[in-house]
Amino acid sequence: EGTVTEITATGIGAHASTPDVGNNALTGLLVFLGKLDFASCPQVDMVRKTASLFPHGDVNGKTLGVAMEDELSGNLTLSFNMLTVDAASMDGEFDGRIPVCGNDENVLEVVRARMAEQGLTLLNKALIPPHHVSADSYFLFSDRYEETIKTLYVDNNT
């Protein structure tokens, strides 16, 4: 009693478009915390429920029921990135790359329903609509990208 234990979880960072090449420290930490014999309390219960929705290694939303892909943009990717828990609340953030076939109905509302089943509330009102940029787009060539960024952010702000 009165002892404080500090736990540091270290992962391998990865872009949200390729979370499979990383090792998510947060979801790994949730696995570890879920195995500890904590007394039941709302915070511990919510952390365990969150861990059940975002299991370590599930980078495509399978557990949430939103795994999908299309030929143009590939697989949906999902990364659980932030979690803050205090005596009164819990707040988490996840990032995803949604294929162009994804929308509010087949992604956002499915996630909202799965979270509600666990007593969690998704606050997002709408998805940022998926988009695709062709690989041969003028914008993607590095010299053109740099030229465009310079025009947008330097030339227009001087």
What residue ranges belong to the model's regions?
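Transmembrane helical segments that form the transport core of multi-pass membrane transport proteins
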Residues: 111-122
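N-terminal entry module detector
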Residues: 1, 108-111
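An extended, acidic, His-containing surface patch that forms the Zn2+-binding/catalytic region
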Residues: 13, 17-89, 97-106, 121-158
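Hydrophobic residues positioned within well-ordered beta-strands of beta-sheet architectures
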Residues: 5-7, 78, 92-94
